[in-house]
Amino acid sequence: MRLKRLFLGVMLLVGITGAGAANAAPEDISASISLKVPGNDAKQYPLALQKMQDGMYSCRASETLPLDIIRQVVDKDGKQRITVTLKALENVYFNYGEQIKTGYKHSDCQFYMPGFWYRRNLRSPKEAPSFHTSDSWLVREDRLSTPLTAAFNPASGTSMSVIRIDKFDKEALTTHKEGEIILSGETSIGYTGFCNVDGVTVLAYGFPYKEAPKTYIRKLTLAPAVEAFQLLRKGDSISMTWEVSERNAADFSECVQRTWEYCYDTNRPKPVDTPYTVDRMKEVMSNFFVESYVGNTPTHYYSGVELETATCANTDVAEVGFVGRTLLNAFNALEYGKQQNRQDLVDNANHIFDTYLQNGFSPAGFFNEVVHYNRGFKETRHSIRRQSEGVYAILNYLNYEKQQKRKHPEWEKRIKGMLDSFLKLQNEDGSFPRKFKDDFSIVDASGGSTPSATLPLVMASKYFKDKRYLASAKHTVDYLEKELISKADYFSSTLDANCEDKEASLYAATAAYYLALVTKGEERAHYAGLAKKAAYFALSWY
């Protein structure tokens, strides 16, 4: 309960902050529509906004178009709600778009597209969307957790955003992934993004989707731009709605916080109704502990790495932490098995702990964190994340066993040895190297995975009553505060890429949260504040 109360306190320390005024004048708006006849190149028509009455505009091209376009703007609570309605005078394939000038100098700006783009994505490689490739990007809305783009201007301490308002209940297949493509039916998906126009940032949005200057088709693979065209039949109409708002923000972290709160208030997500109870889902999920158990290798494990979804057949990969999480799964199986009187789950979990104690360590005392048994391969490069997650799992196991009046002195000795090795690995600035070898030589010095070590260090300080571990944990958060949280630069927690990373923000928030649990007064409030600041970045991915 104390855990829940602190979490709620962290999330509710600051009330929801309203958006400021956003008054985009007609001269700050540029609109265009592209029309395509299948088999021919599309033609783009710039549109002039002709005022019909207050807040109502007719969008006109320099030549007669086969559709009418009406743009309505409603000011409400300092925000502008824009609704564009197209009515076809004959069958037409269209792509409509707008741009709004922010007035911000593009070279000053940082950008936020929830779950996809943070600041300038400069930690991402040039093979992925980032400023390395272009300073202007348009993307499909369904790449984002919310169909929104925000530009933050540190010079003025302001941020402007545009969000799409729709039901998002339609999608259509296409035969091509690049170039001008015809949709096979109706879609709900438009596009959003930002562009550098003569050194000034503009927010760009439209419908249906397009992506430019590249489309991201799979990991580290950029393809040529794509632009979709949807059929609007003669006599039919379609309406699209966006909302533009502006807000003050002291830094990029506050921009993310306030924009996420605005997204939440705008979208008002609600719990998903489901006929399944928690107990029923636990029962179903516990089948993983049965089906994936491998008991004929030197260390027993649950198979979940490199899984082929077509067969779900067990593989030869035993992994501590990250995807495999064999030791934490064993603890979960043990605890659940005891609760449900499932002796099979309890026995298998204990076999995993026993075999890892006997055969699961490197010569230097670190976990053999990845073993390919059929291939006869053991990963010799250790990661602070997998090692930490293994220690975290064993500390949970030891604490549980202690409550059952059972002792495991050999495990305690092993874990203390690993934790003492952690203290040797820790850098003067509080960080831990991302990857290292048995001889403590560094493979990857990046400190982004540091918060994964904070959790077991805090737990160990309580379990072993050793203040050294708590001091080390506090030093990790000194590093996190200086290099990640204060800079809004969450990176490299995941093991397969050293880039902007939701797990890094989640781990940073959790690390600060753990320290808030074991401290008091102003120190506790400070850690809780750091946890809240990092938590908004983690939340923004969802």
Which residues does each PLM region occupy?
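Extended, well-ordered alpha-helical scaffold segments
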Residues: C255-E291, N341-N359, Q403-L423, K465-K482, ...
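Low-complexity, Ser/Thr/Pro/Gly-enriched N-terminal "stalk/linker" regions
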Residues: P26-P46, K51, L232, A250-E319, ...
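Alpha-solenoid helical repeat scaffolds
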Residues: K405, E410, L419-S431, F436-P451, ...
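Short Pro-Gly-centered flexible turn/kink motifs
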Residues: F229-E254
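Carbohydrate-binding/catalytic loop surfaces
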Residues: T297-E319, G365-R386, S431-S452, D489-Y514
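Well-ordered alpha-helical scaffold segments within catalytic/enzyme domains
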Residues: L327-Q343, E389-K407, S452-D466, Y507-E523
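Bacterial N-terminal signal peptides
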Residues: L8-G18
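Beta-strand/loop-rich accessory regions of lumenal/periplasmic or secreted enzymes
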Residues: N40, Q53, C59-K234
